[in-house]
Amino acid sequence: MEDTTFLEGANLAGITTLMNNLHINEQANLEELEKQVMGKQQSFPTDHFDEELNGLAKSLGINFNDPEFSLDAAHSVISKKPSGRGSDKVHGGIRRDSVCTDSICSDSVCSGSIRSGSIRSGSIRDGSIRDGSIRSGNIRDGSVRSSKTRRGPARNSSSRNDRGYSLSTHRKKYAESEASQKTAISKRDRKNHYAESEYSEKSIKPSTKQVDRLINHLRSNGDPNSFYKKEHDYERKTKLVKLEKINMLLTYLGNEQISTDDIKIPTIDSSMQEIDDVIEMLTLRNVGIRYSSIAEEILIGLARGLEIVFDGTREIPFLNYRPDYTGLHNTFMIKLFKMRYETSQVVGNLVQNMSPLSKICLELGPSLLLYPALIRTKHKASEDLYNLLQKGPEDPFTAYNEIHETLKKNNK
């Protein structure tokens, strides 16, 4: 049989070093007690249940290994062989055929004809029946009728009320329990199920992880002060890294001329929660501006495309309509500037699960579409201004108005 014990006390290694000795008896040896607890073996509850069940059966005089409790045992009251001179004598002073014969039901003890109180202690002497009979008063009607005992509903109903335990009923219950055990979970499966349910992996809180690290450190070094020093150094390094991230975000926002005066900058002495809150606020402010810029560039690029396709010279098929979208990007710029928060939210929901490479492509993609249009507008404005200056109008006010109109037209 496989060993099902496990060492639960091994998880308490080093626990005595964490205990406060102020309220502990000075004569107590904590190290010795720890060794005793760690070396103690603990069994499964199923084994403890089996031990209690066997002890209870022993106190009641029940032996589960007795053939009497098997389904194949003969239908007799006493299954043990009689000890004595002959086979007619029975164990304990009762003859085998004197109690359960053909005239009396073999499935019960004296059903109907012998009551539970008819045979009393002391009525059978010397372990045998004198003169082959039982004295009067011990059995009602003076004797047991052979081959003439009536078997009917009345006798059977009276046997149910007898205080004597019917072995046929016991065999029936035992057979039902045997059948139910075949469909039940085996003992090994119950133990495995118990182990998996009790010791399944659960979510570990940070405080639990810290306790585990402390116990592992005590097992290796045994000095709790050095562990706390390492924990303090680790927390300090984490704060320095996060403070550097805050400085980088402040630099980015300063280059974009975004104010951060309302945010209190933490120091190395600030708590970790305060530092995390500042990082979250600066990150939201930074990505909000970036995401709104991405949305503006994409929508303005689409407006530029409509201006190129529908400039008033092309006709839409089947509609006989020539739309002119020249200068649409200026209208888009004004509208999008008022909706920077909404556009940043839309882009933020789209890019939150994107990889860094995809974000870079999304940032540079609209610029590839807008750059040719910007260069073309710049060259056209320079050419118009150069031609106007070469013309040299006589009236300076007329020249100024023409230059102003040319620049205004090219900026559309």
Curated annotation (Swiss-Prot):
Biological source species: African swine fever virus (isolate Warthog/Namibia/Wart80/1980)
Key words of the record: Late protein, Repeat
Induction (UniProt): Expressed in the late phase of the viral replicative cycle.
Sequence repeats by residue range: 112-116, 117-121, 122-126, 127-131, 132-136, 137-141, 142-146
Residue spans of biased composition, Low complexity class: 116-126
Region (7 X 5 AA tandem repeats of G-[NS]-[IV]-R-[DS]): 112-146
Region described as Disordered: 116-209
UniProt-recorded name of the protein: Uncharacterized protein B407L
Homology family: Belongs to the asfivirus B407L family.
